[in-house]
Amino acid sequence: VEPNQVPAFPKGREDNTHLNIYGARVIAGITVDAIAKEVPELAKYVRHYDFVVAQDGSGDFFTVQEAINAVPDFRKNVRTTILVRKGVYKEKLIVPESKINISLIGQEGAVISYDDYANKQNVFGENKGTSGSSSCYIYAPDFYVENITFENTSGPVGQAVACFVSADRAYFKNCRFLGFQDTLYTYGKGVRQYYEDCYIEGTVDFIFGWSTAVFNRCHIHSKRDGYVTAPS
């Protein structure tokens, strides 16, 4: 697959002589359901995904942002499930408020990474600031994430957020948040967030913000002596 080309849309359009994405999924779903029916012990391993992200071109999209953008706005009655295959996706991910009810599932080794920091300048020569430094921004309610690593690789250069969460009822399971200062920004005032079996590391007040956040069975690792949290 050529760089910057989407496998699902050769030359920018669907090929009517072959199955499109929806048709391929229907056929695959029928096949998987038939196998599960014939071999019931395999049924528990079946998981259906609406979109697949893969850097090698084997999925529907090359980047996580492309998959998020493809989700219909305000899809209220059903969840959209996205599988992220193994790889380091260097992108500044934004999940806008309209992309509700998304489940983002990572294979082992799925990483969303960027290297902005507060004192880094934008195109206008202004400092990005703490909020502008994040590798990922999540605003959409009812967002579920499993087995994804969020990291900021800028190093010990001051505030550098790995994940900025302003979403209500956000649920993170078996995720990792890697950085130094200000790793996890539980930003949203009055919103609720739940973190289960997650790993969070940093140096200076690396868990902070206004949200009501619950951390259940999480490993919180301070990379050196200092404050872990800075509640607002």
Each model region followed by its residue ranges:
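Sequence-level preference for short, compositionally simple segments enriched
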Residues: 49-232
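Catalytic His-Asp segment of secreted/periplasmic serine-dependent ester chemistry enzymes
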Residues: 1-46
